Amino acid sequence: MHGIGNDYVYVNCFEEQVEDPAALARIISDRHRGVGGDGLILIAPSQTADVRMRIFNADGSEAEMCGNGIRCVAKYTYEHKLAQAGGEFSVPGQRSFPASLNIETGNGILTVGLIIDDTDKVRKVCVNMGQPILSPQDIPVNLTGEKVVAQPINVLGRELLMTCVSMGNPHAVFFCDDVRSIELEKLGSAIENHNLFPNRINVHFVRIDKPVEFTMRTWERGSGITMACGTGACAVCVAAALNGRQERICTGHLPGGDLNLHWCEEDNCVYMTGPADEVFEGVWPEK
């Protein structure tokens, strides 16, 4: 399954048990010797929500949250009838969705609204991604102060200005004039592993196109360059507003597609809406 190109292998743990998910993630994510993907996501029963999701990056490390992944988990859960959808889900001051699910994540229980077509298929999912975390000690970043906004950082002999946000997982956002010319693999890896970030960090380079649109490229912690990062797009929405560069309701253009974002003043939560697609099902042989 994928959310605008951010592709993971999903395992239905209502039916299967995965003894070593970190090892499986490394093997199955290999695009030459495995299925190929940005990582592995387990969909499992939950004691406190409709389902529980666990995310493993391509290098086997476990992630707290995946914005594109949670939309795919919602689609799979509804269409494969792992749980019955609940009632209405509303975005304050915006629209309402007739069906909802609660999904347990490493960032707590998140509620999603489902856009369902006439064939009972989920076409889009809106996720309440929760409130952004801005304090450096909670992101975490080895800096002092209340926020990390337009903070200088030295990377490979260059001084860059970063804004850091956690959406349950850590993000460093850098604004630039041309995202295509950025040496993303070189800079992304260096920033991810910089000593300012005790848990490493996701890295995003962003161009502001209009007051309501931006274009971004991502280097994901543990996975490298990806087509999209949902939590990253939410972090960019927040970072752009904090820097006075953009409005709180905007559209993010990612290499894999677009996401609609809203950092709501009423409840301080970030709402993300986008598609989710199931590509194929298969059987992975035990080795």
Which sequence ranges carry the predicted segments?
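Short, solvent-exposed secondary-structure boundary/capping segments
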Residues: 120-129
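A glycine-rich beta-to-alpha transition motif near the start of alpha/beta enzyme domains, typified by
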Residues: 1-121, 172-287
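N-terminal, positively charged, Ser/Thr/Ala/Gly-biased leader segments
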Residues: 1-17, 127, 139, 144-165
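Ligand-binding beta-strand-loop-alpha-helix segment within the catalytic cores
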Residues: 133
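Extended Gly/Ser/Thr-rich low-complexity repeat segments
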Residues: 136-145, 281-286
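Membrane-interfacial helix-loop segments of redox and metal-homeostasis proteins
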Residues: 165-167, 189
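Selected transmembrane alpha-helices and immediately adjacent juxtamembrane segments
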Residues: 162, 170-173
